[in-house]
């Protein structure tokens, strides 16, 4: 599939903020470091983010563990990102948190100068069945808007290959539409390697009247077992030809890394040619592959 053919199929999106109209947006995702060194829970993040500083990301987001398990680490990492000069964007997941808990976190982030939130249902905490999660991301978006008005831009998740819990693509699209109706101003997708899936998803969204920017999530490939495990857990399709080549390179670490960078670079090139409003990299707190892919794309700086 050529980039030219993809580009001809993508409907234009309607930007909700000035940044969406200035060019492709580059953003990076990190998680709170599991080890501490130097500055408390945030100590391990400095080296990674500073290696990626020259990419001039529009923002750096920080994940929030299942059931709020990394709440303190997320707050510390967000604070450290701000100290290092980055536009920090915390994830919030509703899990088993109360509306009051969420409100307190929103107040904390507002005091830090945060202007954007990634609002998610989040992973189901260990020992908590899905039936006990009476709230979802739509509820969280409504809580954020009720508590903070229009102070925050709100990003939500989107699933070009359909959320694994959804009974059908139509049901999943309805879930997404309800999050947008509740007040979301943009979306970041689950990662994928099939550009057609993204193109078709955006087309269905536009035909359904959903006009927020939908930024594709990008997962670099650096390890066979890791990408297979991630893909199985989140319902992302790892195309057979990619998996076959990764298996052939299992014992050739440099070759596997080079192949992964080449494949993901190609996916990103096709997405940008197709009119994707940006790229959001799931760095897994590693800088090498993300830096190499962005270098291949000529993304030495991103839209501010």
Where on the chain are the PLM-derived regions?
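Short, acidic/polar
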Residues: 37-52, 74, 99-107, 168-178, ...
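Active-site pocket-lining/capping segments in soluble small-molecule metabolic enzymes
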Residues: 4, 9-19, 132-159, 165, ...
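Acidic (Asp/Glu)-rich catalytic clusters
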Residues: 17-21, 49-56, 75-85, 106-114, ...
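Active-site mouth loops of central-metabolism enzymes
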Residues: 25-44, 66-67, 88-100, 153-171, ...
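Catalytic beta/alpha-barrel core
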Residues: 60-70, 92-95, 118-120, 185-194, ...
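Active-site-adjacent beta->alpha loops and helix N-cap segments on the catalytic face
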Residues: 16, 39-41, 68-80, 98-105, ...
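Conserved, mostly hydrophobic/aromatic
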Residues: 29, 60, 109, 179, ...
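Conserved N-terminal beta1-alpha1 strand-loop-helix module at the mouth
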Residues: 2-59
């Amino acid at each position: 599939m050529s980039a030219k053919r993809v580009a001809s199929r993508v409907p234009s999106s309607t930007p909700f903020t000035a940044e969406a109209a200035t060019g492709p947006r580059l953003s990076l995702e990190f998680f709170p470091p599991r080890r501490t060194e130097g500055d408390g829970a945030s100590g391990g993040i400095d080296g990674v983010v500073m290696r990626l500083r020259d990419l001039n990301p529009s923002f750096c987001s920080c994940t929030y563990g299942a059931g709020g398990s990394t709440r303190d680490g997320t707050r510390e990492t967000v604070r450290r990102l701000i100290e290092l000069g980055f536009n920090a964007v915390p994830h919030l997941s509703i899990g088993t948190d109360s509306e009051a808990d969420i409100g307190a976190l929103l107040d904390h982030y507002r005091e830090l100068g945060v202007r954007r939130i990634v609002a998610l249902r989040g992973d189901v905490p260990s020992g908590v069945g899905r039936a006990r999660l009476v709230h979802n991301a739509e509820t969280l978006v409504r809580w954020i808007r009720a508590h903070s008005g229009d102070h925050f831009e709100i990003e939500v998740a989107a699933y070009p290959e359909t959320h694994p819990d959804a009974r059908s693509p139509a049901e999943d699209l309805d879930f997404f539409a309800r999050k947008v109706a509740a007040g979301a101003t943009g979306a970041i997708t689950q990662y994928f390697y099939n550009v057609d899936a993204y193109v078709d998803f955006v087309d269905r969204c536009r035909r359904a009247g959903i006009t927020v920017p939908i930024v594709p999530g990008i997962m670099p490939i650096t390890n066979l077992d890791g990408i297979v495990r991630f893909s199985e857990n989140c319902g992302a399709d790892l195309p057979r030809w990619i998996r076959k080549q990764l298996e052939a390179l299992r014992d050739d670490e440099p070759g596997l890394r080079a192949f992964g960078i080449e494949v993901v670079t190609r996916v990103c090139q096709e997405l940008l040619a197709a009119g994707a409003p940006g790229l959001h990299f799931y760095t897994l707190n590693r800088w090498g592959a993300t830096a190499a892919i962005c270098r291949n794309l000529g993304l030495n700086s991103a839209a501010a």
